[in-house]
From Swiss-Prot:
Top-rank taxon, per record: Eukaryota
Matches recorded under SMART domains: Costars
Family: Belongs to the costars family.
The protein's name in its UniProt record: Costars family protein ABRACL
Species of provenance: Coturnix coturnix (Common quail)
Pfam families noted in UniProt: Costars
InterPro entries linked: Costars, Costars_dom, Costars_sf
GO terms classed as biological process: regulation of actin filament-based process
Amino acid sequence: MNVEHEISLLVEEIRRLGTKNADGQVSVKFGVLFADEKCANLFEALVGTLKAAKRRKIVTYQGELLLQGVHDNVDIVLLQD
């Protein structure tokens, strides 16, 4: 699977699992994304896909590296629709 395809799948999953925030952007907690069974099956390296999407300014989140448990409450915000 190529990176662009994985990012497009990630965007779909953020839309599926997330909610709109006050700014009208869709966001989801990292822990929700990480724990979702469909995401676990889709993404071999969820954190790597998130980093690639952040570099392309498709999503944003606090920090550089997200770890399960430690960063479960970090919001992943979709910047592009």
